[in-house]
Amino acid sequence: MTDQLRLMAVHAHPDDESSKGAATMAKYVSEGVDVLVVTCTGGERGSILNPKLQGDAYIEENIHEVRRKEMDEAREILGVGQEWLGFVDSGLPEGDPLPPLPEGCFALEDVDKAAGELVRKIRSFRPQVITTYDENGGYPHPDHIMTHKITMVAFEGAADTEKYPESEYGTAYQPLKVYYNQGFNRPRTEALHHALLDRGLESPYEDWLKRWSEFERKERTLTTHVPCADFFEIRDKALIAHATQIDPEGGWFRVPMEIQKEVWPTEEYELAKSLVETSLPEDDLFAGIRDNA
């Protein structure tokens, strides 16, 4: 009898799950995979990015509650489970020099202690596969970088009963694979950019490509390409549910859906660790697991 496949996606803030790997999650849900999103913070220090909602006094005063409601709506759209890790948003520091991070925020937590909270989730849910961000956080937000750190510690720590005793953290369990989300990769961005220009359409990616080198991003190894074009509409619907964070008329939604599906019908990942044999490149996060489950 085949064991239930389970995928855990670890994210920093509400809305990250809908902008990074959402179509992949929706695809796996449709196949009967149990998918759980773990959200590390409440996004309390996030700015209101939707111009139509800026200046709304209720939202500004109740941003934590509003973002939780948005997360719940997105969760229902994607069909996933979702749990909070309970840490406080660090905010994105700006200025030169950068100001210190606020006391008590996620990025200043002890890594091993914070990872212990994720160990509890892993031991309870028992996913074979975990997704998160690379060591740069996908982009250098302190909460994204911290999310990477605690996920990698928890991947190993979930099976370590000395570091995380079963009496406190639950029955030990070892996940089999951990991936980095790499959906915002240069090959995809360039392909969509040129596809739009070739069709005489305006591209929202031109400035993005010009600024790419400013982030000093190394080119990542895209090991895994998950076909999920049939779920792009669900992805966008979930993202729009985060109304405070997304302008539905902004550049994110300027690329016609038919072009996205034709030019780049996959979401990309980088296999960071695997305890099972697999052959690269992959088209399935459960490659090497599915046949043995």
From Swiss-Prot:
Family: Belongs to the MshB deacetylase family. Mca subfamily.
GO function term, MF aspect, one: zinc ion binding
Protein name per the record: Mycothiol S-conjugate amidase
Cofactors required: Zn(2+)
Protein source organism: Streptomyces coelicolor (strain ATCC BAA-471 / A3(2) / M145)
Record's subunit section: Monomer.
Biological process (GO), any one: mycothiol metabolic process
Job description of the protein: A mycothiol (MSH, N-acetylcysteinyl-glucosaminyl-inositol) S-conjugate amidase, it recycles conjugated MSH to the N-acetyl cysteine conjugate (AcCys S-conjugate, a mercapturic acid) and the MSH precursor. Involved in MSH-dependent detoxification of a number of alkylating agents and antibiotics.
Cofactor comment: Binds 1 zinc ion per subunit.
UniProt entry keywords in alphabetical sequence: Hydrolase, Metal-binding, Zinc
InterPro entries: GlcNAc_PI_deacetylase-related, LmbE-like_dom_sf, Mca
Catalysed reactions listed for this entry: mycothiol S-conjugate + H2O = an N-acetyl-L-cysteine-S-conjugate + 1D-myo-inositol 2-amino-2-deoxy-alpha-D-glucopyranoside
Lineage: Bacteria, Bacillati, Actinomycetota, Actinomycetes, Kitasatosporales
